[in-house]
Amino acid sequence: WIKQDCLTIPAEHMKMKRLHRVPLTAYALSLLNEAKNTSKHKRSSYVFPGQKSSKHANSQILTNFMRQNSFFKNRLVPHGLRSIARSWMADHNVSYEVAEACLAHIVGSSVSRAYQRSDFFEARMQIHKQWDGFIQDCARSAQLTSPKADSIETPSLSQS
């Protein structure tokens, strides 16, 4: 699913049954690579295998983590992360169409969609790079990462 700087989610795995390409920054790739390398199941084809088997992790794992963690409990749910990102995009003057494309939302009438078929990948890559910087700043402020985290080289997680 990952090739170079793009994660392609097949249509059958998407809510709206449409293929979705996600731009990946160097930092995002490094986090995915770290997750894969720290897994108990290094031979699994999944970045996030389950704890007890090499099959994929339970889809509710993040929800369960947030419910059990005292910091997040009653403060944030996974879907709230999408809301935070969307609000950040609005505050940073990201166009409506590009912001909605970042969330894999379908916008416009069936007629307008017949003519506008771009997934705005290049524009979304620029947004992801800006969001990446925001996330790294937040992580540094919370002392969750080193000050040099943004000097990470692009890792070799991608499969050509």
Where are these predicted regions, by residue range?
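Active-site-proximal structural scaffolding
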Residues: 2, 15-17, 25, 79-83, ...
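A short linear boundary/processing microfeature
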Residues: 15, 37-38, 105, 117, ...
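Short, basic (Lys/Arg/His-rich) helix/loop patches that form interaction surfaces
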Residues: 22, 30, 34-53, 60-101, ...
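Acidic, low-complexity interaction regions
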Residues: 121-133, 141-160
